[in-house]
Amino acid sequence: MLWYNPVKIKKEIFIILKNTDGNNVFAKIPFGVIQASNKINQYLLPTYLYLAVNKNIFGEVKTSVRSIREEYINTANRTYWHEDEFYEALIVLTSNIIDEENNSIIDNLIDIKNFEHLSQMELQYNSSKNLNTSSDFEAQIKNLVKEFDAETDYSLKKKDIIISINSFQTGKGFVKCSYQEYNLFRNFQSFLKKNNSRISICQAINAYYTVKFIIKRNEALINLGLAKKNCSDQVSKSLFKKECCFADNTAKCVLQILKSMNLIEVVNNPKKENDYYIRLNKNINESETQQ
């Protein structure tokens, strides 16, 4: 079962999709979205995933910023909690994001009806500055989108919006989200709410697909002869923390959640104390090397 939560339909309505293989490709997530979600705005990947999922089910997306927010924020009684971040995530997804060397990070992945002009924006951030925390990157993006707030008058948050998903260059790399994975995250959100977890479902989603992204990238480097074969199916502790911008305690908590969902395995490094490797659970994850 998968969920859909348009504004005018009561929340928690479930749609039964018959004859669906849980390991079929459900959504393709560009590498750039995963990296930008860790370094620019932690809601980029969850927002894109929400839009792609509903597009695949219904053929179109009619939603609102509040609808997206309600799927991922634990504090249900705070109506506008983190709404600005989801608004900014939509702005970023419509835009073309480049780094200081003009390398493309994201290329206009969505279009918003009546706001198509936003897709012409080119936002540049300097990755050589403020590398310590993701909030520093978010602050840069906040400054970049301020000038557009007056023009749009936050109307993206006030009413339903129709969003189209643009195709992206698969040559830049992507990972897959299956029905099975998506349902695991959707169901686990209820557990996090009941247990008042300090870890958000957004952090868990970002961390999991970052692990998939690193492993997929390793496979590509091995095929090019640029990496050792023994590193293809695992991610080191240091690389995981660096890519996710996590402190030690946060990394441990997130990994514990992903382990409890049976999405990953954590293996101690026999050569180094307090070190570990992260591997995907083979029972849930199919190899992507053939895709």
Report residues per predicted region:
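Glycine-centered, phosphate/nucleic-acid-interacting loop/turn motifs that mediate DNA/RNA or nucleotide
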Residues: I97, N108, N262
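Short recognition helix of helix-turn-helix/winged-helix DNA-binding domains
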Residues: M1-N74, D84, E88, I105, ...
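Phosphate-/nucleic-acid-contacting segments
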Residues: Q234, F246-N249, C253-Q256, V266-N281
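Short acidic DE-rich linear segments
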Residues: E286-Q291
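Short helix-coil junctions and helix-kink-helix linkers
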Residues: R69-W81, K237-D248
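Short, Lys/Arg-rich nucleic-acid/phosphate-binding segment
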Residues: S104-L123, N268-Y276
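Non-catalytic, interaction-prone regions of core transcription and DNA-replication machinery
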Residues: K113, L224-A227, S238, V267-P270
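Short amphipathic alpha-helical interaction segments
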Residues: T79-N96, F246-I257
